[in-house]
């Protein structure tokens, strides 16, 4: 979704959705590109980014800055009054630094709490929150946090106040049984299916 034309189209469609809405974004491809330009090595384990001090600076610049503000600007152009946030902004989401075992992911956060009142207040004011995948621990430290997890946690929290639908958007047509075959979309995944696919390595 980081391709400019694809993102523009997605945001145009998002802007046409009636009623209250929240947008959560990632930006991993852009972060990797900027890191490479800065001579910083990108290390991934099971699809998750190892975030040392240097990489934390990169993802904060890219996620909370470049990507987030570009999305906000495009939404404003579409007539959507939006506000870009990290978890540290107005303290909307706190995380705990992930323990370094069995894998030390560095400055990566696991969500601890969502400030539902803050998000609900923004929504009530007609503001669309645009949430970047950077949170904080409440002790002055920023943490790289999975965007899908942020979307999930925000949806669960807001479901206490609103009728919530959680929609994931990505480049493929769905979850693929074979990542090299775009026609191998799995139309429905139950919890049992998920556990079986994870066990046999179809998904990770």
Predicted ranges, named:
Residues 1-204:
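Nucleotide/pyrophosphate-binding catalytic subdomain
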């Amino acid at each position: 979704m980081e391709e400019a034309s694809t993102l523009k189209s997605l945001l145009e469609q998002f802007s046409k959705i009636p009623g209250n809405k929240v947008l959560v974004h990632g930006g991993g491809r852009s972060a990797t590109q900027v890191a490479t330009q800065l001579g910083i090595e990108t290390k991934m384990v099971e699809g998750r980014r190892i975030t040392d001090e240097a990489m934390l600076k990169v993802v904060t610049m890219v996620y909370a800055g470049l990507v987030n503000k570009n999305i906000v600007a495009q939404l404003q152009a579409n007539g959507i009054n939006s506000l870009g946030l990290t978890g540290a902004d107005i303290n909307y989401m706190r995380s705990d630094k992930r323990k370094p075992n069995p894998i030390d992911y560095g400055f990566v956060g696991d969500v601890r709490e969502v400030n539902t009142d803050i998000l609900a207040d923004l929504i009530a004011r007609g503001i669309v929150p645009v949430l970047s995948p950077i949170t904080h621990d409440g002790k002055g430290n920023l943490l790289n946090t999975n965007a899908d997890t942020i979307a999930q946690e925000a949806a669960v929290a807001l479901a206490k106040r609103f009728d919530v639908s959680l929609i994931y958007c990505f480049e493929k047509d769905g979850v693929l049984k074979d990542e090299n075959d775009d026609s191998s979309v799995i139309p429905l995944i139950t919890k049992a299916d998920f556990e079986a696919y994870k066990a046999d390595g179809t998904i990770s």
